[in-house]
Amino acid sequence: MVHDAAAQGYQRHAAAYQRGRPSYHPDLVALLVDRYGEGEVLELGAGTGILTLPLVAAGVDVIAIEPVEAMRTTLAERVPGAIVLAGTAESIPREDRSVDVVLASQSFHWFDAPAALDEIARVLRPSGRLVTVWNVRDEELPWVAAYTEVVDRHAADTPRYRSFDWRAAIDGDVRFTATDDWEVANPFPTDPQGVVDRALSTSFVAALDQADQDRVAAEIAAIVEPLGSSFDYPYRSELQAWTLAG
């Protein structure tokens, strides 16, 4: 199952997604490789490969699952060393007990959690790990708060990281035990166009008609104009992990 906002927005604006989204902190990538990089790693909702690329470069065997064709095409072009497949978290195209780690980077909030957790439990080997990874913006800076206010006008009922419904669903599933919770500041060097691209890559903004997208872009450009030609977009990179009962 793919939410309409994701299906429409990401299909139309995969390029903006790739330009506007931050990479993950090198320490987070190193931690993933060290603690979760052994065996087969299945990445759900892999997008354009923002996390897939450094994992494969570090020698991790990644099976990347992505439902949106435009994102999947970009992913396959950018990361030829990954196995790239069409699929969803609710219908994973892998055999029972076939992978060691299931990874969801910036994606678990999109899933139908009960159905996805059933599928994740099915494809994981006993004592396999479920790992979620996120880049989360720091809302304390006034310009970031202003950015969020503009973007969130269009959110409606779109699933969001900040609801934490995704985490409650995992923590409430008795098959999974929380084992890791880690974060690091991850300032992302950017420029005014990069922040506009970040806004346009937001699923529900990308699904708007062109006139509304243009209005969002103009408002965001006005917010960041005083920041100059280059500046940091304040993020933190987060990782949470759970172990499947063996």
Where are these regions (language model features)?
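Residues lining the SAM
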Residues: 100, 104-105, 133
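A short acidic, Gly/Pro-enriched loop at the edge of an enzyme's catalytic core
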Residues: 90-101
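Class I SAM-dependent methyltransferase SAM/SAH-binding core
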Residues: 48-91
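Conserved class I S-adenosyl-L-methionine
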Residues: 1-37, 39-45
